[in-house]
Amino acid sequence: MSMKQIETLVFDYGGVIVNIDDVSVVKAMESLGVTAFKRLIHVRKIKRLMHQYINGLVAESETLKEMLSLCRKGTTTEDIEKVLEELCGNLPVERLEALVKLRKRYKVYLLSNINDTLWQKSVSLMKQLGYSTDELFDEVFLSYAMRKEKPSVEIYEEMTQQTGLNPATTLYFDDRAENTEAG
């Protein structure tokens, strides 16, 4: 497919638009007493927590309470919130500038597995850099609001139905191969 045939661009947020430093996140978790051993032992619990958190299936307070149970005594929800801010990553202004330019030629959508708290922090960061989501994207699709997550087919179907985009003329940018394959 040539770029002349492309009409729509769909971007993931974490790992594509914003840089996420997994090492920093792990170090931040370890600072709260969530060691590699604990992560290994509680891998199912952590995956379930993150799935529920990212998809808005449980209240944030409930997620934080369960996360506290994995941390060393004396850890507060504020400590965990600081660690979660690490997930907001580093947002290069050049990428935001590129999105604005791309919107002049293509429909540009965001499709991301993210929770409300991290999204609000990300929106705030974009504003600090001088941009609004309306300037950057034609529409935003977030897992927590849709109660679906990539790579489930349902999230792509809903986005396609709402936007009328043609998957055959759409490029997907995601840091996970399974998400671009599903799209």
Tell me what each language-model feature is.
Residues 12-15, 56, 102, 110, ...:
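Generic structural signal for small/hydrophobic residues in well-ordered secondary structure
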Residues 4-93, 104, 118-121:
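N-terminal helical cap/lid subdomain that shapes the substrate entry/recognition surface
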Residues 155, 175-183:
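Acidic, divalent-metal-coordinating active-site segment for phosphoryl/phosphodiester hydrolysis
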Residues 116-169:
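Substrate-recognition "cap/lid" segment bordering the active-site pocket of phosphatases
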